[in-house]
């Protein structure tokens, strides 16, 4: 089940798994979320793109990466005009549609380190995680990838059902 509920202090907390890399459909649209798979978002002078591991859109290849699971890549192709692995760093958002911010008191991102074999010694570090709501009311899970490499994660929202 996508939902797990448990009672606590007369409140019902709902855990919804928004995204799991074990899903083979790219970005788990069946779980009611959407992710930019090409084009990404613009932050300053850099464009952060979310692409499936097997997706070669915008020249992002899957070579040198582990297989068997989806991956979110954070690319900054405008850094030097290419999709260089060396420039894969920055902040990003995974957008979650149709979620009322008031219904979710907090969230949790579970992730594991995954060495990007195209960048020697480069591991993922997540900081600055938090919920983000844009001007149109779209709620996103914000993460920051300090060191580049490939991000693997299971994203959950824990919320107070009201």
What does each of the following model-derived ranges do?
Residues 1-162:
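Surface-exposed molecular-recognition determinants
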């Amino acid at each position: 089940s996508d939902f797990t509920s448990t009672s606590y202090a007369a409140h019902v907390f709902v855990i919804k798994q928004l995204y799991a890399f074990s899903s083979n459909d790219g970005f788990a649209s069946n779980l009611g979320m959407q992710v930019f798979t090409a084009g990404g978002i613009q932050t300053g002078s850099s464009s952060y793109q979310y692409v499936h591991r097997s997706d070669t859109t915008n020249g992002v290849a899957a070579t040198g990466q582990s297989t068997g699971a989806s991956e979110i890549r954070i690319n900054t192709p405008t850094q030097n005009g290419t999709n260089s692995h060396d420039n894969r760093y920055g902040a990003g958002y995974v957008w979650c549609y149709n979620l009322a911010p008031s219904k979710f008191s907090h969230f949790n991102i579970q992730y594991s380190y995954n060495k990007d074999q195209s960048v020697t010694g480069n591991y993922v570090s997540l900081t600055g995680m938090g919920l983000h709501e844009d001007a149109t009311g779209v709620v996103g899970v914000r993460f920051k990838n300090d060191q580049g490499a490939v991000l693997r994660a299971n994203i959950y929202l824990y919320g107070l059902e009201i």
